[in-house]
Design a protein with these regions (language model features):
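Outer-membrane beta-barrel biogenesis signature
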Residues: 26-72, 141-148
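Surface-exposed strand-loop-strand hairpins of Gram-negative outer-membrane beta-barrel proteins
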Residues: 32-38, 66-92, 170-171
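Short loop/turn motifs that connect adjacent beta-strands in outer-membrane beta-barrel proteins
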Residues: 50-58, 102, 139-149, 191-198, ...
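Residue-level signature of outer-membrane beta-barrel architecture
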Residues: 52-54, 97, 135-137, 155, ...
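Transmembrane beta-strands of outer-membrane beta-barrel proteins
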Residues: 59-63, 105-107, 131, 147-153, ...
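Transmembrane beta-strands of outer-membrane beta-barrel pores
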Residues: 65-71, 109-115, 137, 155-161, ...
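Outer membrane beta-barrel transmembrane domains
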Residues: 68, 72-81, 215, 224-329
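Residues that define the transmembrane beta-barrel architecture of outer-membrane proteins
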Residues: 87-91, 122-131, 147, 174-180, ...
Length: 329
């Protein structure tokens, strides 16, 4: 299954496109009825963040569960090579609150468990914690051309373990560094020829990371006895997402994303006191995330799909099955 991931991805994308394109042909003999916004319920795609803010006093809870499974290592020329099998189980939960109608704040806690190389984590491990604020700059109105636009600011705190992993190499789920992300999110609506709604999101974000003090074996590949620091590379991400309303409850969704991570540098001394320096190459990844949403009501829905990295440079080809529940209180 994993080795055929790119082929499966293309099949899923073809299915999503076919749903949108086939419907007009079935309705040639009758004028399509334009779907109303009230008749379309959404959870949101797997990756792209919404530009809308919560109404004042409302809250959102959205837990994600996933398992990142590598199926190849992609080198600097974009060629894929075999990679050891592994399971990287994880969870992250969006806990958001509408402070005002135009400002939403929240937390994103993370945790994980890994099985790789014949060894497992000693238990469920905490990851880094993100604090988030989002301010809405513009709001889409039906008949208008301006999308909903918001400015997002995130600060990720290094709460997860990242070093001193000499006896438990699979316990590292943190970076050890503070990370500041600035993003611009937009969202708008289109009506397809058959009258159904196509909701579209565009996210652009840049993340600046600080230094991490490192001792011993770490997530940066340092050996036992090492003392020094690591500087993770800054990251740029752009994500274009589409959601097609099949019925009021059912939605087909897909994210098309690109991520570039700058080089990570590590410097210090090893256990023998000799100088130790490493620099990882710049990595790039093409990310696809097809999914299906089912909404029980306008405030409760579930989404299931996969985050797939089929191509890139100096990255890991992987398939990550994902399921999430979206609930607005």
């Amino acid at each position: 299954m994993i080795t055929n991931a790119p082929r499966a991805c293309l099949a899923l994308i073809s299915l999503l496109a076919g749903v949108a394109l086939a419907a007009p042909a079935l309705a040639q003999d009758a004028a399509p009825v334009r779907q109303s916004l009230d008749d379309a319920w959404w959870t949101g795609p797997i990756l792209a963040t919404g530009a809308s803010t919560l109404p004042k006093g409302r809250a959102l809870i959205e837990p994600y569960l996933y398992d990142a499974k590598p199926y190849g290592a992609i080198d600097g020329q974009g060629k894929r090579h075999a990679a050891p099998s592994a399971d990287n189980y994880g969870s992250q939960t969006y806990l958001l609150y509408g402070v005002t109608d135009t400002f939403t704040a929240g937390l994103i806690p993370r945790s994980g468990y890994r099985r790789a190389g014949g060894r497992s984590s000693s238990g469920v491990q905490l990851g880094d914690l993100t604090v988030q604020g989002q301010y809405r700059l513009a709001r889409w109105k039906q008949g208008g051309r301006t999308p909903t636009i918001s400015l997002m600011l995130q600060e990720t705190l290094p709460t997860g373990r990242h070093d001193r992993l000499d006896t438990r190499p699979n316990d590292g789920f943190g970076s050890g560094a503070y990370a500041t992300t600035v993003g611009l999110n937009s969202q708008t609506y289109f009506w397809t020829p058959n009258g159904r709604i196509l909701r579209t999101r565009l996210n652009v974000a840049y993340t600046v990371l600080g230094h991490a003090e490192v001792e011993g074996a770490s997530v940066y590949g340092t050996p036992a006895g090492f003392t020094g620091r690591a500087r993770p590379g800054d990251s740029f991400n752009v994500d274009l997402a589409f959601e097609y309303s099949i019925t009021r409850r059912w939605v087909a969704a897909i994210d098309l994303a690109y991520q570039r991570d700058a080089a990570t540098t590590v410097s210090g001394v090893d256990g023998a006191g000799a100088a130790y320096a490493r620099r990882s190459p710049v990595s790039q990844a093409l990310i696809l995330a097809p999914a299906v949403e089912y909404n029980f009501s306008p405030v409760l829905g579930v989404i299931a799909g996969a985050r797939i990295i089929p191509a890139g440079r100096n990255t890991t080809a992987s398939v990550t099955p994902v399921i999430a529940v979206n609930y607005v209180l």
